[in-house]
């Protein structure tokens, strides 16, 4: 319904003369009065993320908003609004308003959606004349963290080269190319979230409903509360909800996509067909089958990929995933004629590779799933709807579908907390850790994989070991974690 989501006329910057005046009177206040920033890049694998009151603050959000506005305007073919939303964290109001102030200082109109899933921002940005979108959320992180995710006019994550331009502005390395003669305006557009809900249901409405299915939803006290239950109910499902209030103190706490135990128990207690757990901003989802077994992103990609393959909707039988994808998944997918391409961890890298190769399905083991037939970015609600529809159409339980798919290789992922940001991001310079990795890789050869990396979203170093048997997996995980703790922890 693009026609009903058009820009309110009369915003500054419509005329060439106004566009040429971008930045007047504010270059000194935003370009010279810099705030302290860490030595390493601000933008990680999913935007800017950190502890509120430490890395993230209202002054930082104000300047991020301003420089985001400047960069979006400089690269826009015509001036339009920026769409802004947030999750339920207590700090999200503060950061959203500060960021909006920065965007309007850059002469841009802001459409503020309030509480909404991150994919809602991406979808509305892609179908309207918006020149970008911003989501205030730290996704699956704890309540005391928050983050800033920036989207381009196409609804995809902002390219790294433009992220670098924003950061250069924040660090005082560039000045606005043009100047702003007038400030923008801030408009509340809460009604637009409903357009996103309609878009989620549209591909399924004409062919399939969820009548007769009992589905448990864990909303993680986050951005999907309200919207997710209504969408599943309108599709005909009987819905049981967990953690279905917007609660900034409890978002992601022992619930959602990183804590599936309560969801699994509830599915079994109510004899439900399937359960879905979302993270705080609902851009990712994990499932629980009817027996209470956890179903991660590898299984979701395999099952959805096989469905698309059978319907000749998967070009080159290609799935794009990351280095975290299980070897069991890869080998099983290859056995049915599939091809798997791995990227670095982060849905922005998956999305970029899908665009490069023409891939239509991709995602991460952690539950970021993108199907370009229906969306422009990873979408937890859309993925959950299509997985439920897939089970309904198959006429068998999700447990049976999983049993018929593949056996995973034993894989252990351990997180080692390293609060010193520079030490964490520079872990590769630690010789003892590198020597331990080399020793482990030589010992396992082709029978396993090792991945050590600094998280782009949390203050941890992740150690992943995957091997043909559990004994090897456990041994080398313990060895590597011990080295990281010994040489990198505070």
Swiss-Prot record:
Keyword check for Thylakoid: no
PROSITE patterns according to UniProt: PGM_PMM (PS00710)
InterPro entries for this protein: A-D-PHexomutase_a/b/a-I, A-D-PHexomutase_a/b/a-I/II/III, A-D-PHexomutase_a/b/a-II, A-D-PHexomutase_a/b/a-III, A-D-PHexomutase_C, A-D-PHexomutase_C_sf, A-D-PHexomutase_CS, Alpha-D-phosphohexomutase_SF
Modified residues annotated as Phosphoserine in this record: 139
This protein's UniProt keywords: Isomerase, Magnesium, Metal-binding, Phosphoprotein
Entry annotation: catalytic residues: 139 (phosphoserine intermediate)
Chain sites annotated for binding Mg(2+): 139, 279, 281, 283
A GO cellular-component term linked to this record: cytosol
PTM statement from Swiss-Prot or TrEMBL: Activated by phosphorylation.
Cofactor note: Binds 1 Mg(2+) ion per subunit.
Catalytic activity: alpha-D-glucosamine 1-phosphate = D-glucosamine 6-phosphate
Family annotation (HAMAP family): GlmM_B
Name of the featured protein: Phosphoglucosamine mutase
Gene that this sequence comes from: glmM
């Amino acid at each position: 319904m693009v026609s009903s989501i058009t820009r309110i006329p009369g915003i500054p910057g419509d005329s060439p003369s106004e566009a040429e005046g971008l930045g007047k009177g504010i270059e000194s206040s935003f370009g010279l009065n810099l705030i302290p920033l860490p030595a390493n890049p601000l933008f990680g694998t999913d935007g800017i993320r950190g502890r509120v009151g430490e890395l993230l603050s209202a002054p930082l959000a104000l300047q991020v908003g301003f420089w985001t506005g400047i960069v979006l305007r400089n690269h826009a073919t015509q001036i339009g609004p920026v769409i802004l939303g947030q999750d339920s964290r207590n700090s999200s109001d503060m950061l959203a308003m500060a960021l909006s102030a920065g965007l309007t200082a850059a002469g841009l109109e802001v459409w503020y959606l309030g509480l909404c899933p991150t994919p809602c921002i991406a979808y509305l940005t892609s179908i309207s004349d918006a020149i970008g979108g911003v989501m205030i959320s730290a996704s699956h992180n704890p309540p005391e963290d928050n983050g800033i995710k920036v989207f381009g006019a196409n609804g995809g994550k902002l390219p790294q080269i433009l992220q670098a331009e924003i950061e250069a502005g924040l660090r005082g390395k560039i000045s606005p190319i043009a100047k702003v003669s007038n400030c923008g305006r801030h408009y509340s557009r809460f009604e637009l979230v409903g357009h996103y809900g309609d878009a989620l249901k549209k591909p399924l409405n004409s062919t399939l409903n969820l009548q007769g299915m009992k589905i448990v939803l864990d909303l993680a006290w986050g951005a999907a509360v309200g919207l997710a239950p209504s969408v599943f109910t309108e599709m005909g499902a009987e819905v049981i909800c967990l953690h279905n209030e917007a609660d900034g103190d409890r978002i992601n706490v022992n619930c959602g996509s990183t804590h599936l135990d309560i969801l699994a128990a509830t599915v079994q207690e109510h004899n439900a067909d399937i359960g879905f757990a979302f993270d705080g901003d609902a851009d990712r989802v994990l499932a629980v089958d009817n027996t209470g077994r956890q179903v991660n992103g590898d299984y979701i990609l395999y099952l959805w990929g096989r469905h698309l393959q059978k319907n000749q909707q998967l070009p080159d039988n290609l799935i794009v995933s990351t280095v975290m994808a299980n070897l069991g998944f890869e080998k099983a997918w290859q056995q049915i004629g599939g091809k798997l391409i791995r990227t670095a961890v982060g849905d922005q890298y998956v999305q970029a590779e899908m665009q490069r190769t023409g891939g239509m399905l991709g995602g991460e083991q952690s539950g970021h799933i993108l199907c370009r037939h229906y969306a422009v970015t990873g979408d937890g609600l859309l993925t959950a709807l299509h997985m439920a529809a897939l089970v309904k159409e198959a006429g068998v339980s999700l447990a049976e579908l999983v049993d018929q798919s593949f056996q995973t290789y034993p894989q252990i992922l351990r997180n080692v907390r390293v609060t010193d940001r520079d030490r964490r991001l520079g872990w590769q310079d630690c010789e003892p850790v590198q020597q331990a990795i080399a020793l482990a890789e030589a010992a396992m050869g082709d029978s396993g994989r090792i991945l050590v990396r600094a998280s782009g979203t949390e203050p941890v170093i992740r150690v992943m070991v995957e091997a043909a048997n559990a004994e090897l997996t456990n041994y080398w995980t313990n060895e590597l974690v011990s080295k990281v703790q010994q040489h990198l922890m505070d």
